Every structure is written in C-alpha cells, then in structure tokens.
C-alpha cells in the first residue's frame, strides 16, 4: 500500500519536477557572446541547444571584451575565462587544465573552433583524464544552389577560400587521430560543403564515431506587450533585424534599397548588440528618415520581446548557415524574409528573396503587411519548428548521441 501511495504521488507531481540532468558538458571556444562573430554565436547556439536537451553546460573561453554586455547572457552557461598570460604559457596551462578537469569532471568536452586556442593542451588533459573530446564541425541544412552563385561563397573570395579551406579542414581532422576518445560533432544531420569534406577525411582516417548537435532551443514566449510602448514604436508594422552590424549582414545595402522604394508607414528596426564603425555608417545612411530605428545593447528579454511583437523578422545577409534569429521567429509564429542564401531556403514560414533588389524587397514587404499572409506564414514556420527544431522533437528523433 505504501508503494502505491508513493507511485501515485510521483504520477501526479512528476510533471512539476525539474528535468533530470543528462550530465555535464564543457564547451571550449576562443570567443563567446556577447561578441557577435560566427564562432561565438555558433557556440552560443550549441550551448543553448544542449541546455534545452537537459545537459549542464559550462563554457571555457577567453576574457570577454564587454563582460557587462547583457545581450546574449543566459544563466545556463556559466563561464570560466583563461587570460592570455596563462594560455601563452603551455606548461602552466597544462597544469591548470589538469586541475580544472579534475574539479569540474565533465562527461564530455566539445572543442568549438577553427583556431588552435588551447587545443593541444586540452586534448592532452582530456586524454589523461579519460574524458571524451568532441570536435565540433560545421554543418546545417543547406540548399546547395546557394553556394554556386557569384556573390556567395565559395566564389566570394575564391582564391583565398581555396587556399585556406583544405588545410584548415585537414588540421582540424588531424586532431582526431591523437586520441581514440575523439569524435566529430555536427550541428545538424544535413550536408554542406564543409561537412562533406569532413566526412571524406574522417572516412580515410577510419574515424567511425560522429555525434550530432541539432539547432534547438526553447520557443520564444509571447508575453504581455510592452516593447513597442517602451521604445515609442507606433502602431505601424514593425519589421525587425536582430543581427550585428557588419558587411556580411548588409544592413547598409538594405537601407539604400528601402530608400529606393515607395514603402511608407513601416518601421524597420535594427537590434545591434555593439555600436561599431559599420553601425555609424548605418546611422549616416538613415539620416532623419523616420522609417528606420536602431536600438543598441538591449538585454536578452527585450530582444525576445522585440521579435515576438514584430510583424516580421528579416535578414539581408549573403551567407546564413546558422540563421538563429529566423529560427527564433519561427518558434513563436512570426514570419520572416531573407535572401536565398545558405540554409535559409530550406526553412518555411517566410519569403525567400530570389535576389537583393529594391523591387524584390518592396514586393516582399508589401506582402507581409497583409495580416492574412503573415498569419499563414507564421503558422507554417511554427509547424516546421515544432516538427524539427523544438527540444522535444529533437529528443524524439534521437538526433544527438553523446
């Protein structure tokens, strides 16, 4: 009878219990948000994904340039920073890492970088401690056509790309020969040019073990509206671009194209984590045009509120292998538009721009001012996210095997 009481108690209250941790993962990356470079953001996405799948995450990285920046701060990613004075002294670094791993005792280490920051020392420490050492490779769902256009990589900087590509990939994969504990880790079980080369090299080295880290995170939740009122945004449609200011994101080109259209009574909102010289050029290009707003250094809750309260989210990049902001919009049913680049054309719930021109942009924006169109696209995006990117869907599909 006592057993049945305990069983019933667990049955009724198990849904309120916190999820059981699957273990500890140490992510090692030489840059991590708030810095907005590709490796840093990809490491952030990976930390977010694994945390959503009930892993305890700890990040080992370099000191942040802006430690006070709250843009991407999350409580699930405690940080340990290694100063340059330590990482440049190999003997001291090895001693520190041995002690760190002994105290922290991660179940697995994921090294995330194309650089060799602390890699050899960490690999030795992992081998001595018997901790599996995973190497994170590139890879996400990709429409291969997007790679074979004159304004997209690899044709963008073709000579440099070819000269560096094979050596970089070989150097990374050579790490896997130094320990039987090594594995390759991929962001997604879909092919890219990078990943195909990795598979080819791994097969030649008889590396049979691969792990997949899918791109997943908890859905953005719609809360009571406050963002528009706080920042004085009118009732006009708001289209939001949550991306760092850079040439790769092409916000300047977007501004110039909008100015060549007849679009009116629309606010194009740029959420930029750090003001830089490119952002200053954006400010100059905008001038006193009321259609544009830039907000800097918003805390993460306000970034999420901006997305959920937007009529649409947009990007204008020429390369998007990990379109996190688009996936975030899909998770809460917000439509999007973006150029046909990288993984974007495989996603639903938005409008893919076949080319970057004022006329194409104007047509897409006008379509998204229609409420019925927005609702239809939003539902499509949400369905795809729930079926493929939501944490419970990822767990069901067993895409990750650590």
Feature-to-residue mapping (PLM):
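Nucleotide-activated donor-binding/catalytic signature segment of Leloir-type glycosyltransferases, i.e.
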Residues: 280-301
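Aromatic "clamp/platform" in nucleotide-sugar-dependent glycosyltransferases that forms part
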Residues: 318
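Conserved short C-terminal alpha-helix that flanks the catalytic cleft of nucleotide-sugar-dependent
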Residues: 228, 368-374, 378-392
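Conserved small/polar residues in nucleotide/adenosyl-binding loops
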Residues: 400-402
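Conserved donor-binding/catalytic core segment of Leloir-type glycosyltransferases
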Residues: 26, 221, 232-249, 255-258, ...
